Amino acid sequence: MILNKILNFGIDKNYFIKKPIKQIKKSCCSLEEEIIDFDSTKEIICKEANQQTRKSCDGLCLKGSINFIEFKSLNNFFEKEFQYKLNQENIEEIEIIKEKVRNFNFKRKITDSLWLLDYILRHKDLSLKNNEIDECESIEKNYFIIKDEFQPLINLISNLNLLANESNNLKYRKIMDIEIKNSLDVLIKIELNKPKLIDCKQLEQILKEEK
């Protein structure tokens, strides 16, 4: 299959470094399944192509389909950054969330990630034939945003105030989910399936089902 050819080429040329998901730099999942550390791919290609640093997704999985993977630790955001801004700045909760989602810059990350992959596909040493290029273009391309599971009792022993705020925290998480999904809706394009916001368990299931 063409994906195996691309994967093997990427590994041989040191474009692709595979790591367990739990070892990917920004991972919020403790999964053993290996994927490509796409941040490393970005650094290697940008240096080789004499390009300014681009954005990229955190991971890439070439197995059955082309899966771009971005990790977002929402628990970490709500426990630290959100609480800090709520206490230190005169900003409404929803505006803090919207600002954070804008800063995620999903559009730039997937656009640059597609460019990085295209750079490899057009590499002279890979020498894909026309029918192989057509096959590659027909393969499904997915963009998954992976969130960690809601942890309402995080640091409860050291901060009992979280117990009273638990319902609010869950409410804010739901608002964040909606804002992320809304931002992903505008990214639908011909060569990309509708981006999805999923959790670690859903990611694990998707990767298991990939052939």
Place the predicted regions along the sequence by residue.
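Basic, amphipathic N-terminal segments that precede the first structured/catalytic domain
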Residues: 1-54, 204-211
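Generic recognition of cysteine residues
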Residues: 28-29, 46, 57, 61, ...
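Catalytic micro-motifs at enzyme active sites that drive phosphoryl/nucleotidyl and oxygen chemistry
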Residues: 47-50, 57-58, 126-134
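Generic alpha-helix structural propensity
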Residues: 54-55, 108
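Residue-level detector of short, conserved catalytic/binding motifs and their immediate flanks
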Residues: 55-57, 67, 141
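Conserved catalytic cores of phosphodiester-cleaving nucleases, focusing on short active-site segments
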Residues: 59-61, 65-73, 113
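Catalytic cores of nucleic-acid endonucleases
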Residues: 74-152
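Short, low-complexity, polybasic intrinsically disordered segments
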Residues: 132-207
